[in-house]
Structure formats: C-alpha cells, structure tokens
C-alpha cells in the first residue's frame, strides 16, 4: 500500500512536470522571436519647370533641376521581446536636406538613431533621435504618395532628439508625450532649449502638439476610406513663432487605386505665412496654393511616379527668368523609387 502511494505521487509529479513543460513550450512558441531587419529605399528623379529658368517651388526635396539624385536610405533595426533599436542613415541630396540641423561629421548621415523599451504592456519609452510625429508627409519618398513635398511639411519639424513615452490606451486610442531638444538638432542640446510634444490618436486621426520657447504648433493629421479604392488624407496645421511670425495651412490628399499596379492622387494645399516667416517672402504676409497630380506605377519593389505641379502665390515670388518674376509656376517631375 505504501509503495502504491509512492507510485501515485511519483506519477502525479511526472504528469505535472510534463504538463508544465508542454505549457512552457507552447508559451515559447507563441512568443515572437527576436528579429533583425535591414531595409531602405533608393530614389532618383528628373525635374523641370515650364519657364525660362528652371526654378523650383520653395519646398523641400525634389527641387534640383534636370536629372538628379534623391537619396539612399539604409535602416538597421532589432526587435526583441521588450526592447529594440533603429539605426537609420541617409546619403545624397535628399538625405542632406533631411538632416540639415546636424553640426557636421558623421552625424550628417543620421536620420534616426534610437532605442526603446516596453516598461509595461502598452507603454513604450523611446530615447534618441526620431522623425517627427507632426504632419502627413515624411522624409522617406516610399511612404509619401506625392514625390514633391508640401509647404507645411517643408517648414515644420523633420526630427526630434529626446525621450518620448507611447501609451496604447485602447485598440484605436493612443497617447504620446515627449521632451525634446531644439527641433532638427540631431546630436545634442547646444542651446539649452527644451520643447514638449504630445500626440493623441483616435481611430486613425491624430492631434499633434509641439511647444517651446517662442514656438507653438498645433497639427491635425488623418484620413478616411471613402470607398474600398478611394482614400482621402487630410492635414491642417498652425504654427506661431516669436512676435507675429508664423504659418498655417491645410491640404487634402484624395487617392484612387485603380489596380494592383496603378494609383493616382492629388494634393491640394493652401499655405499662408505672416510677418515675413520666410517660406514665401522675407517681409510681410504671403500665401500660396498648389495642386500636385501624381501617378504611381508599381512593379514589385519598384515604383515609378510621374508628377505635374502648379503653384500660385499671392505675389511674384518665382524667378522664371534672369529679369522676370511671376506669381505662378508649373513643374514636372518623374521619379523612380526602389524599396527593400
């Protein structure tokens, strides 16, 4: 009887051990394995304007004439169970323009460089340099529908160096809070400037805030699926600097996908500045309305984008010849983008 009792206890222990082993194995199998990734883009283009001098709109990127280079963008990332990092470097004219706030040396290559840690479920802390959370458009040409960029994107922040906390509050509700150096100052805080940022995400719509000494920007970025193949993106922003200087704008991005390989999209942007902000004029107030029509042909990882753009300003800001200025400008761009 005593031996039988010992046998039953031993059998129970073995059963529990095997069960816990299976459960541990199932847990290990369901947990995502750490991953190391290498990705990026390469882009190049041809640009011309329908004027005697090949002047370009005063927006970032895609503003060189004739056959021109965009950038090579290489991203190395590692994602573990609770932590990871991103190292994002850029080469070429577009990359140099994107990191214009760098003081020099190797930092001129750094587009993003940050590490993150999930301190709890739905709470992530990120430290380093990362692209901005404001605006509809981004630095990578593969992530934008239009190849040329808007005035709102061009004169808003490109990146921030600091710390931020991302909170997942519900399935479609998120909150980000951050403390940053001076906007676009990549390496360090050289002027003891501190900015504060916040983002509230509600069902795919985002309210963004960036504030610091002599700077305040409020931004809305979002969009709606009007139909299965028709999307409408929206961006609106207003920024106030020292004194009465500042800018504001709104843009609509209707995009129609006609097949697996072709889509067509329009960007209509109204942009205004006050007290010589400098995007359009150096003194006084000015505004500009632009229409950009872009086609997107895709084959695998390759995308071909022909684009026609018209800018119309409130004053003659475009130097269309050595002796003549105009209040409007028409441009044409053909871009090739490869993503991997």
Where are these regions (language model features)?
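Surface-exposed coil loops of outer-membrane beta-barrel proteins
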Residues: 45, 50-66, 95-112, 120-202, ...
């Amino acid at each position: 009887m005593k031996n039988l009792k010992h046998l039953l206890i031993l059998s129970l222990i073995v059963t529990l051990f095997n069960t816990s082993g299976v459960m541990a194995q199932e847990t290990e199998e369901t947990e995502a394995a750490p991953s190391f990734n290498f990705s990026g883009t390469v882009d190049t283009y041809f640009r011309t304007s329908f004027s005697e001098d090949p002047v370009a709109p005063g927006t970032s990127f895609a503003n060189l004439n004739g056959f021109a280079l965009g950038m090579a963008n290489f991203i190395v990332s590692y994602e573990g169970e609770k932590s990871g990092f991103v190292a994002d470097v850029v080469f070429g004219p577009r990359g140099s323009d994107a990191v214009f706030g760098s003081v020099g040396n190797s930092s001129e290559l750094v587009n993003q460089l940050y590490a993150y840690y999930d301190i709890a479920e739905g709470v992530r802390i990120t430290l380093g340099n990362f692209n901005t959370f404001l605006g509809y458009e981004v630095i990578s040409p593969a992530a934008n529908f239009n190849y040329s960029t808007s005035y709102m994107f061009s004169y808003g922040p490109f990146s921030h160096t600091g710390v931020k906390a991302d909170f997942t509050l519900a399935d479609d509700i998120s909150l980000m809070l951050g403390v940053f150096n001076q906007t676009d100052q990549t390496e360090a805080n050289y002027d003891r400037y501190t900015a504060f940022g916040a983002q509230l995400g509600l069902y795919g719509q985002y309210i963004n805030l960036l504030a610091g000494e002599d700077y305040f920007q409020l931004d809305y970025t979002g969009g709606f699926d009007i139909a299965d193949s028709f999307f409408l993106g929206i961006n609106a922003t207003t920024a106030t600097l020292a004194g009465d200087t500042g800018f504001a704008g709104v843009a609509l991005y209707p995009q129609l996908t006609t097949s697996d390989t072709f889509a067509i999209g329009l960007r209509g942007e109204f942009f205004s500045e006050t007290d010589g902000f400098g995007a359009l004029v150096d003194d006084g107030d000015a505004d500009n309305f632009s229409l950009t029509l872009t086609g997107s042909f895709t084959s695998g990882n390759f995308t071909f984008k022909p684009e026609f753009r018209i800018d119309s300003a409130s004053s003659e800001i475009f130097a269309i010849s050595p002796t003549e200025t105009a209040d409007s400008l028409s441009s044409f761009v053909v871009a090739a983008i490869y993503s991997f």
